[in-house]
């Protein structure tokens, strides 16, 4: 009997082989961001310079923090975004709790201190933010008012109708402020403060950037805004000053994350690597002058360590149930 092995080998060699299919090329990158449009132009130019091939595939959708993250949650079953870029860390913490994010440790993220990163790498922080008073010098002089120096000052009747703030249900800045005052005063006293402050407000805006822009243009003498936005407006010639409240500064930081179920995960990871790089951080600093989570990039603004920052528990502030409760009560009391 002839051995069967040579025959089997011959038959195997005659069977046509089909190579394993190569992974499908990712031809898109969709980014959801809460950065303002004017600063995005600067950041995007740096991105195109550093990663032109990826930038050619990329697009971003810009919105205020609240609606942007609500959209991510609404799309959970069929994600349309690959990356979240420049969103307040409390919202990112909430998104991680809801299962909306995928862990990814971006290259160079080791240069970011641990307190500015999620312990399971759900997000990494990049830009630090502080809330201050945007005071239009010309307008406040015309009204013969002195600029407020503290949160307590804003309750003075002389400022009635001269203050603009934003809505915490749509603005990350406003929610940050709400949670910060809760931490500073305790919830009961915080609501008493907001009830008194509401009497002096002329307008409550949807966008957190609007109060600063309105102060810069002279539509209001006082806007409660992110300090870096006021500094940018001042550099561009607006008659505006930044005043940090003496009785405590609300602060947070923005971060980036990979969306769970992203359709273009490899492109997303390349972008996230870039977004914490020294080149990207330098572009953030060039526009904002604000402090960064990386300490190896110089900034023109004040150092966080030199400021009277409100002690805030970001995990608590980012808890969806806590946030929903505060925002719901604010809407019940102050919705216009």
Report the location of each language-model feature.
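Extracellular/periplasmic bilobal clamshell ligand-binding domains
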Residues: 301-336
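Early extracytoplasmic/lumenal segment of secretory-pathway proteins
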Residues: 25-94
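Short beta-strand->loop
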Residues: 32-35, 102-108, 119-126, 135-137, 143-144, 152, 221-222, ...
